[in-house]
Amino acid sequence: MDYYQWRKKNRRRKRNLQTKKPLNYALKLLKYRVRFEDELRERLKKQGFADEEVESTINTLKKQGYLDDEKAAYLFALDEMRLKLFGPRVVRMKLKSLGVDEEIIERAIEKALEEIDFHEELKRLKGRFKDRWELRDYLYRRGFDPSLIEEILNKIDGGEE
């Protein structure tokens, strides 16, 4: 074995040792996107780390501010509502399926609803539908409450006249 093969082999071994640490693996996962506590716990256990190591890693990340379910839920709700145009009902179901606490879900959705202006988004969307009923059905399927749909449609119709 020559020097270059030996160096390559040792570099690979060193890289494997570094990624075997649960904190390094968790930081690697958090580098790509914000994750929820349960989601990260599941991924670490799936990777084969012991329960004590997983809990210690999660506590460390919480203390350092890298892991915050409230912030993650808010960002998730904001993205789903603004980019994918999902309503609160669908976002609530998705967050529940990710294992987020009920109180955190409600606060995140309220905060996201305050920040998003659906009227501008839906004005552009209205041109795709023949009539008001089609748009209403579309919004209901996307998870909007009937009262919110009526409010939005009345504002859109009132703004055009």
From Swiss-Prot:
It is found in: Cytoplasm. GO terms for biological process: regulation of DNA repair. One of its GO terms (cellular component) is cytoplasm. Keywords: Cytoplasm. This is Regulatory protein RecX. Pfam families: RecX_HTH1 (PF21982), RecX_HTH2 (PF02631). It comes from the Bacteria. The gene is recX. Belongs to the RecX family. PANTHER family: REGULATORY PROTEIN RECX FAMILY PROTEIN (PTHR33602:SF1). Modulates RecA activity. InterPro entries: RecX_HTH_1st, RecX_HTH_2nd, Regulatory_RecX, WH-like_DNA-bd_sf.
